[in-house]
Amino acid sequence: MTKPTGFPTRVQAEALLAEAEARNPGPWTAHSRVSALGAAALAARHPDLDEDTAYTAGLLHDIGRRAGVTAMRHVLDGYLYLNELGFPGAARISLTHSFPIQDLACSAGHWDCTAEEMAFTAQALRGLEYDAYDRLIQLIDAVALPAGCCIMEKRMVDVALRHGFNAWTLNK
């Protein structure tokens, strides 16, 4: 297995999340920690995944929430922030984690971005071929609550209660 590039170390990722939590505290940080532990546990048993990379990807997938209380904007904010820091692999996860289907319309929240920002996000998403880390974090994001992992249906109800139910919810 080759360790992917473009991800911070665990120590760096923990520092980034701590700084983000100080800026915008909320249950999203506990969810991120649960996601990190779950992703690392799954990666430890997978022959092609690196446990440390999976941990940092899980820890930072929602890092865009550092900017404040937003809906789908956190995807773009995280992508831009992590790219600016020189972590394109982690930035990619911030972008892909909300889209098991590569279409902005399938998101579980409203878009609080400008039309130009949405177009940029759509283009960036379309240009990717998902890898095992993208899929791993999509999976763990779908089962991680702030208090721990749960069955996927419970998490989907949690998301639907907060963000609503749309035409893509069942397809996901």
What are these regions (language model features)?
Residues 10-25:
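Generic N-terminal amphipathic, Lys/Arg-enriched alpha-helix
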Residues 38-42:
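Active-site hotspot residues in diverse enzymes, especially metal/ion-binding acidic/histidine motifs
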Residues 27-29:
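A short, charge-rich alpha-helical start-of-domain segment used by transcription regulators
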Residues 18-22, 45-159:
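Divalent metal-dependent catalytic cores for phosphoryl transfer on phosphate-bearing substrates
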Residues 166-172:
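Charged phosphate-binding loop/patch that engages nucleotide di/tri-phosphates or the phosphate backbone
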Residues 1-8:
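Non-catalytic interface/linker regions that flank or bridge core catalytic/transmembrane domains
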Residues 163:
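Active-site/ligand-binding-proximal alpha/beta "capping" segment
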